[in-house]
């Protein structure tokens, strides 16, 4: 999903623009208390990028935690955005709903951490810090781009024209359905086909993909 929706586009863009690709190691939720796992994940992401053709000679790989200005700008921008605006963010609403109402059938509800409210602000900071003009995203990330544009406008009105209002660039595949039929393929939902998967694992996942409700042999499948 990440390849079809983002990486494929990034490989092309790196030869035409000055590009910065972010490894967002601050933005973890499932294992934020496991530092080794976070560090290992950083390497895995970088290796995936190299494997698909991203070239450090043509673009910059940025590890979020190694640039403290990301956290600093997040703090400053937090003073310009009302909580009500963040609560309307559809991605934030979906993630919070998933934590409060688990889809795996368990009755245990995860408490929503404060960081979930600052998560969209940090994404805004990640875009504004390098003063990005064009941001390659999937369809589900468009609300984040609009939030970034609104934040830039508020900041520029308060002070002076510092941040450009970035434009979104949606790739060839705007949104890829998960292997379980969920509207979005996502690692957090465990419905992905990973770049590092073996041929046997890929075959198993493909054969087990959700193709819609039971139908007759002559009826086409349909996933909404």
Spell out what each predicted region is.
Residues 93-224:
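Active-site cores that bind ATP or allylic diphosphates and position pyrophosphate for catalysis
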Residues 1-124:
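N-terminal Rossmann-like or analogous alpha/beta NTP/dinucleotide-binding catalytic cores
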